[in-house]
Amino acid sequence: MILLENVKKIYKAKSGDVTAVDNANLKIDKGEIFGVIGYSGAGKSSLIRLFNQLEKPTSGQITIANRVISAITGSELRKARQEIGMIFQHFNLLWSRTVRENIEFPLEIAGVDKAKRRKRVDELIHLVGLEGRGDAYPSQLSGGQKQRVGIARALANNPQVLLCDEATSALDPETTDQILDLLLDINKRLGLTIVLITHEMHVIRKICNRVAVMEKGKIVETGPVLDVFRNPQQDITKRFVQQLTDSEDTNETIESLIEKYPDGKVIRLQFIGEAVERPVLQRLMQRSDIEVSILQGNIAQTNNGSYGSLVVHLNGEETAIQQAIEGIHQDQVELEVIAHG
């Protein structure tokens, strides 16, 4: 569906050339939600703006739906852009136009007649959950409602691809989840390919099928989201995964609990996919003569399956504890000893 081959973007500056995207290679399948994550300055925004040619690549080739979009110009490029919708961090709405008029705007530009425009706008208002707000102006809307308008406008011309440029970064956590749920619903209903960039691992976890990690213009790691959570390869990827698995509050809680258990061992278990549903602790207590205390745990869902972690205290004879740990390994659960007496 989308193919990037050795794509490079270099900006000219007084201080010298700046390579924003450095030999990027990506393949994004039709109908998937693909995330690109990186910190500020990683090259994410430059990368996504190459997809619809808001930025031209310095070198390399970009193919979308069997069309080499990096090689076309003029009317052919304008037509291609109608098949690629885009939403932005700060909404980019026309403040002098109502919700209906904002959504209708790309249809006007495309030359769609008035009756068809009206029908399409009604469909989109219903799709994004803005019934009753069609005559409101952007200044009368909440941040989440503004982004819903942006999504509806981006879908006006029935695009095959939706680009999301930090679309939830300006929203509070609750509204972020609502917008992510909407994007997930649109993806399932319309079979739309969604490419989003973000610096928040929560966004990747919640809706993406696969993820690419960017650092200093390079794509340093790609893979299914669950695989990346299971086995991050790069240091930057490990830091992003730790945003969810090792929060500061969680670490402080674990440290305070460890002080209460000077004997035995404190271990962290990582459950991925089907392992989440295995009765690991039940089997552990059945086959081991040790005491098992649960100190802390959480389970979360990704588009590829569940993952979770459990911090437990094992107390008993050293030999029995070691046998218990070996038994956990046999259950194919990842284990880390984080403290021992």
From Swiss-Prot:
SUPFAM superfamilies: ACT-like, P-loop containing nucleoside triphosphate hydrolases. It is a peripheral membrane protein. It is found in: Cell membrane. The keyword Translocase applies. The keyword Nucleus does not apply. Keywords: Amino-acid transport, ATP-binding, Cell membrane, Membrane, Nucleotide-binding, Translocase, Transport. One of its GO terms (molecular function) is ATP hydrolysis activity. One of its GO terms (cellular component) is plasma membrane. Pfam families: ABC_tran, NIL. It comes from the Bacteria. Its EC number is 7.4.2.11. InterPro entries: AAA+_ATPase, ABC_transporter-like_ATP-bd, ABC_transporter-like_CS, ACT-like_dom_sf, MetN_ABC, MetN_ABC_transporter-like, NIL_domain, P-loop_NTPase. Gene3D superfamilies: 3.30.70.260, P-loop containing nucleotide triphosphate hydrolases. Its main location: membrane. ATP binds at residues 38-45. Residues 2-241 form the ABC transporter domain. It catalyses: L-methionine(out) + ATP + H2O = L-methionine(in) + ADP + phosphate + H(+); D-methionine(out) + ATP + H2O = D-methionine(in) + ADP + phosphate + H(+). Belongs to the ABC transporter superfamily. Methionine importer (TC 3.A.1.24) family. Part of the ABC transporter complex MetNIQ involved in methionine import. Responsible for energy coupling to the transport system. The complex is composed of two ATP-binding proteins (MetN), two transmembrane proteins (MetI) and a solute-binding protein (MetQ). This is Methionine import ATP-binding protein MetN 3.
